[in-house]
Swiss-Prot record:
HAMAP family: Ribosomal_uS15_B (MF_01343_B). GO terms for cellular component: cytosolic small ribosomal subunit. This is Small ribosomal subunit protein uS15. It comes from the Bacteria.
Length: 86
């Protein structure tokens, strides 16, 4: 179980050389969060990894807040594309 980083970047980049835009960062974090969520279904007591998951969720929240402040249309498009509720 791993994420295909290149595919996630390809699906969410804004230009040909884009790897660091908020959209790409949020998409990568979302993929990692979904992967870890599945991990916790079988490993309920893995508290060390759960801490990392919470850090990723908080980082994603910060990036989404930044994007919402900078460009609401890009924010709405990203939320809809990734299926995040807010």
């Amino acid at each position: 179980m791993s994420i295909d980083t290149q595919k996630v970047i390809e699906d969410n980049k804004r230009s040909s050389a884009d790897t660091g835009s908020p959209e790409v960062q949020v998409a990568l974090l979302t993929a990692r969060i979904e992967l870890l969520t599945g991990h916790f279904k079988t490993h309920k007591k893995d508290h060390h990894s759960r801490r990392g998951l919470l850090q990723m969720v908080n980082r994603r929240r910060s990036l989404l807040d930044y994007l919402k402040k900078k460009d609401v249309e890009r924010y709405k498009a990203l939320i809809e594309k990734l299926g995040l509720r807010r």
